[in-house]
Amino acid sequence: MKLKNTLTEYGAISKIFHWISAAVLIIQVPLGMYLVDMDFSEERLTIENIHVAVGISIFYLTILRLIYKTFNPTPNLNNSIFTGQRIIAKLNHVFLYISILMITISGALKKLYNGEELNMFFFNLEIQDNFNLAEIFYEIHILGNYTLIVLLSLIHISEPTRPLHI
């Protein structure tokens, strides 16, 4: 197996990015859904802190993945796939990355505008409370998660991506 992508297949680095992202998202999305219905408690605070730390990790992982993707070819889709399907498959991936970044950024902004400090591993962020903005970013965060679930479903059931499964 090659480390880098070729025009016909994904390399080991892309596959590692893919499976780490998949594993983390499989944990993160249900964890967030569980948090929505929890009453305030020590347990909720602990789970929320884990959720935030994992979210920040997803943000950094996605940025690294996009940087890597910029400098490596993406394997071509099978020639038997219609042009419209190719375009849809590529757009789906673009929107997938946008939704992941939207979710992580809106989650961080929701926390900050709620008056909470955000530890970004390398530095701490803190801004002035604005509960109206916190609510808006919370709604964006929730909408982004529903969008992510739909996009992931479309990617994994659509014919254009099948020849390139990682």
How should each PLM-predicted stretch be described?
Residues 120-138:
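Short, membrane-exposed interhelical loops at transmembrane-helix boundaries
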Residues 26-36:
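Alpha-helical transmembrane segments of multi-pass membrane proteins
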